[in-house]
Amino acid sequence: MPQTSGTMDIAAAARAARAEYERTVTPDVTLDDIRAAAERISPYVHRTPIMESAALSAVTNTRLGLKAEHLQRTGAFKARGALNAIFKLTPEQRDRGVVTLSAGNHGAGLAYAAQIAGVRCVVFMPEHAVPTKVAAVRGYGAEACFAPSMETVFAAMDEYREQHGMHYVHPFGDPDVIAGQGTAGLEIIEDAPDVETIAVCVGGGGLLAGIAVAAKSMKPSVRVVGVEPEGAPVVTRSLVAGYPVTIEKITTVADGLSAPFADPTSQRLIERYVDDVVLVTDDEIISALRMILERTKQMVEPAGAAAVSAFMTGKAGAQEGSRTVATLSGGNVDFEKLKRIL
């Protein structure tokens, strides 16, 4: 069947985007960067435990440990990257203040870090953002601004950034953010040196990229698997396309994994270090969430359960009986939403 002009236009645009990505020089993130970040942020973050669960180990047929980032400062791993980025600002950037976009957890992490450093912080969020996450952003002294949806937040934020001259801290593409998130990977390998597979939840890919750099640099044999919601597959689509893409519509119960666009820096690291990225359904995420709540008594948000769902379904590809670790990425729960989905 001959191609229509519309089909050819789309194909040409994809080829151009792929060529542009291939020409783009992105910053590298190394194990040394991550070790330096760990030293820089250590007074302000928790070294979260890897919690053992006999029940989840039985369900997954692996020896599963849970990296408890829901117990982190601000209730999510995001504080790690935000602190590293804020502490590496130049004096001129500090004076300008920082702005970002977030479904909530990165915004709270950046607000927390900015409060420590005495830097003005503005966070753009979707109007449907979880109220407790909005309250956290404001509670740490940042200004919360809103756009109609997650898909439109970037444009609103970017316009504000231009008007006010603020420094943009990318939620998952800033190399200093990625290095900060990678400190969780350092801890995983140090605390569970026999781990064979690490499953990491994926929104934009900053945590996945950081953990993968750290883990693979320290233990090349370890498998690192990203776990992404089926309704927000921006990293999966970007890997298939061969360049970072934007998705027009996001539909997932895991609001913390709802990035509408990918980034060249994190994508390049994922391509280099990550073994696989798998998709999980909302039902699979909810099933894992229910199991975590019932059997471990840990209060996590849906995004925090995504990595566990990949082991429960077998999608993570772990060998039976092997040592595994899943990230519990956050615990900032919307209780009304929790009642609805459970």
Which residue ranges define each predicted feature?
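PLP-dependent amino-acid enzyme catalytic core
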Residues: 2-342
